[in-house]
A protein has these predicted regions:
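Structural detector of well-ordered beta-strand residues that form the stable sheet scaffold
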Residues: 4, 34, 96-97, 119
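Short helix-capping segments at alpha-helix termini
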Residues: 25-30, 113-115
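Residue-level detector of alpha-helix initiation sites
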Residues: 10-11, 101-103, 125-129
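Short beta->alpha connector loops at strand-helix junctions that form conserved
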Residues: 56-60, 99, 120-124
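Glycosyltransferases and closely related glycan-assembly transferases
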Residues: 83-96, 105-119
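Conserved nucleotide-sugar phosphate-binding/catalytic loop shared by glycosyltransferases and other
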Residues: 2-10, 30-83
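Active-site-proximal region of nucleotide-activated glycan assembly enzymes
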Residues: 113-131
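Short amphipathic alpha-helix
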Residues: 13-25
Length: 131
């Protein structure tokens, strides 16, 4: 079984993802797991230290007001979806799990477009922007 897990930026997205991964590994030791995060978030350090395969997708969240920076970020988001589609195509996941953070959006979209079942884990009382 191949599983993509994506979430990042803060520990609030990363540690729930790691907990899910450990539960999967206990039940399905042969599962191949790929963690997709950003190159600048905490996950870029934490996930490889946990012994997990990690791929980074360069992406940043949008500002909550109109700005030229959002135009640039929209372009990065388009590129992130293209990169995510390549990751999904190359890894052939049986399922994709998102735990929040901007990086989960392109991964879950790419998985969904490829017909891969997706799950969103939301631990907050109010869902974040991506979830």
């Amino acid at each position: 079984m191949n599983i993509i897990v994506s979430g990042g930026g803060t520990g609030g997205h990363i540690y729930p993802a790691l907990t899910i991964i450990r539960a999967i590994q206990r039940r399905e030791p042969s599962a191949r797991i790929l963690y997709v995060g950003t190159p600048h978030g905490l996950e870029a350090d934490i996930v490889p230290r946990e012994g997990l395969n990690f791929i980074a997708v360069d992406l940043a969240g949008f500002e909550r007001h109109l700005s030229f920076e959002n135009v640039l970020r929209a372009w990065r988001a388009v590129r992130a979806v293209a990169r995510a589609r390549g990751i999904v195509h190359g890894f052939h996941p049986d399922i994709a799990i998102g735990t929040g953070g901007y990086v989960a959006g392109p991964i879950l979209l790419a998985a969904s477009l490829a017909g891969v079942p997706t799950l969103v884990q939301e631990q907050n009382a109010v869902a974040g922007v991506t979830n």
